[in-house]
């Protein structure tokens, strides 16, 4: 049976609909950085997602080819994730999506070294005739966070974020978004196939102790 990160690491991918604190270890990702409204048709974000999956599935299916990755095991490609911020804003402003900066990313299995990653990018670029020059091997060290499962439309996330901030404050923590630790979302539902009110999104915010 294929290894499924969502099932094996439920604390990171299947949290309750109530906020919780947790320590998130460093993880490696295939990532693309960009700017602008993620909903823009044929926009930068949609192109980035195509790049991510091209590399992710090249790695996943590599065992069927001549290039054998040491330590490979069959696995389910982890869900799409995103880091989001806006210049001059301490919190995400959903009313002005055109000002978003983002890092779209998919978690990599532990056996994917930088060398194997570079092979996969070159292989995907050649096979699919894509420009993958924006794709990068990205290590994200998230640390202590407040996390919650958000159920519903992305535009209703502020209510969940308010609950997370209140939960943290009651425990003498504050939201601590910086250039190194950002608003983080993990997308468990495909919005093209799921009713908006049923979409599941894991939301994380970095926190630190109030001095």
Please tell me what each predicted stretch does.
Residues 1-211:
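A solvent-exposed interaction/effector surface
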